[in-house]
C-alpha cells in the first residue's frame, strides 16, 4: 500500500478518536471490518458510546447516515420501504425505508421482532431489498452497525446464530478508564463535528484494494485447519462455518492493509480471530457449566494448530 492510503486510514482513525476517548482498539477493529466489507455488531450496556461511534464513523467516512431505534412495533417495511399508490400518476411509487442509506445504525436490534430482524439481515446479506415483488439495490457502500443490550435486559431477545453470523465482527466497548472518563466529562468533540476524510466512492475503492492483499496458500490452509478443529472440539456444539472462515480471511487482509502491508501474516489472523469468530461458536452445556469462555476455547484452538512460516510475501 502506498503511504498516502495509510495516511488516509490514520486520519480516519484520528478523526473518530476526537469523539471517542480511550477506545483505540475498538475503533481500529470497526474500521478493519468496514474495509473488509462487513457489518458490525456491538454488544454492550447503554451509555458507553455505541451511538457516538456510529455517528463518528459515518462522518469521517463521508457517508449518508440513518438510525433506527428498534422496538417491538418497528415493522419490516420501516427497514425495506413500501409501495404507495400515487393518484396523480395512477401507479404505485416506492417509498424508501431506513436501509436505503450508506451507514445504518440499527440501535438495540434485539428489541425488535424476529420478522423485522430478518428483514434487516436479509438486506445485509444480499445487498438488495425486495418490496412487492420488485428488487432494489441498496447504495454502495452499505454498512450496518447494530447494537444490542446484554441478554437479560428488559425487552430483549437473543439473536439466533444464523443471524449473528451475518455480522463480520462482534465487539464490546466497555467502560472507559478513570483518566479517559475525566476527559469525557471535561468535554470532547461532538461526533457530528467530525470532518469527512473519505467519500462513499473512495471507501469502495479502498475495499477493493483490500481484496488484492496477498495471502499465501499455507495461510488459507491455516484458517481451514482452525475451522475444522472448531467443528470437532469437545467444548463446542456449533463450530465455524465456511462463511465464517471467509470472514476471517477478509478481516486478516484488512488488518494487513491498515498496517500498510500488501500481504497477510499469521499474526493478522490471530489478532482478528477473537471478534471475528467469538460470536460464531456455541459452547456445550458442560463447557458453560464449568465456566469456560469462547475466548478460552479460541485460544486453545490457536495453540493446537502449528503456525505457518512465511516463505513468500
Predicted regions mapped to residue ranges:
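C-terminal engagement/docking regions of AAA+ P-loop ATPases
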Residues: 3, 232-313
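Pre-Walker A (pre-P-loop) alpha-helix and adjacent loop at the N terminus of AAA/AAA+ ATPase modules
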Residues: 4-48
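Conserved alpha-helical scaffold flanking the Walker A/P-loop in AAA+ ATPase domains
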Residues: 29-32, 85-105
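Walker A/P-loop
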Residues: 34-71
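Walker B catalytic acidic pair
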Residues: 44, 107-108, 119
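P-loop (Walker A) phosphate-binding loop of NTP-binding proteins
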Residues: 45, 79, 147
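AAA+/P-loop NTPase substrate/partner-engagement loops
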Residues: 60-88
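Canonical AAA+ ATPase core
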Residues: 86-89, 112-116, 124-200, 204-213, ...
Amino acid at each position: 500500500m502506498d503511504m498516502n492510503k495509510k495516511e488516509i486510514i490514520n486520519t480516519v482513525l484520528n478523526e473518530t478518536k476526537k469523539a471517542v476517548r480511550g477506545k483505540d482498539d475498538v475503533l481500529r477493529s470497526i474500521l478493519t471490518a468496514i474495509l473488509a466489507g462487513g457489518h458490525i455488531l456491538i454488544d454492550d450496556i447503554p451509555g458507553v458510546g455505541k451511538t457516538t461511534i456510529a455517528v463518528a464513523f459515518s462522518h469521517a467516512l463521508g457517508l449518508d447516515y440513518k438510525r433506527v431505534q428498534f422496538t417491538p412495533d418497528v415493522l419490516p417495511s420501516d427497514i425495506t420501504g413500501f409501495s404507495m399508490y400515487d393518484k396523480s400518476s395512477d401507479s404505485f411509487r416506492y417509498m424508501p425505508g431506513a436501509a436505503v442509506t450508506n451507514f445504518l445504525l440499527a440501535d438495540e436490534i434485539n428489541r425488535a421482532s424476529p420478522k423485522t430482524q430478518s428483514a434487516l439481515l436479509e438486506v445485509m446479506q444480499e445487498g438488495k431489498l425486495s418490496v412487492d415483488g420488485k428488487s432494489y439495490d441498496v447504495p454502495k457502500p452499505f454498512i450496518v452497525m447494530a447494537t444490542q443490550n446484554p441478554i437479560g435486559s428488559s425487552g430483549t431477545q437473543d439473536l439466533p446464530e444464523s443471524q449473528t453470523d451475518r455480522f463480520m465482527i462482534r465487539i464490546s466497548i466497555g467502560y472507559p478508564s478513570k483518566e479517559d472518563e475525566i476527559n469525557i466529562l471535561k468535554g470532547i468533540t461532538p461526533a457530528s463535528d467530525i470532518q469527512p476524510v473519505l467519500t462513499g466512492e473512495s471507501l469502495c475503492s479502498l475495499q477493493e484494494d483490500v481484496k488484492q492483499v496477498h495471502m499465501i496458500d499455507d495461510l488459507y490452509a491455516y484458517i481451514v485447519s482452525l475451522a475444522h478443529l472448531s467443528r470437532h472440539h469437545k467444548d463446542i456444539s456449533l463450530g465455524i462455518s465456511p462463511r465464517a472462515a471467509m470472514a476471517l480471511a477478509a478481516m486478516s487482509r484488512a488488518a494487513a492493509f491498515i498496517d500498510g502491508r500488501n500481504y497477510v501474516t499469521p499474526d493478522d489472523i490471530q489478532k482478528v480471530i477473537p471478534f471475528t469468530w467469538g460470536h460464531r461458536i456455541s459452547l456445550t452445556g458442560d463447557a458453560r457449566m464449568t465456566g469456560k469462555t469462547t475466548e478460552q476455547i479460541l485460544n486453545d484452538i490457536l495453540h493446537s494448530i502449528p503456525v505457518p512460516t512465511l516463505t513468500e510475501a
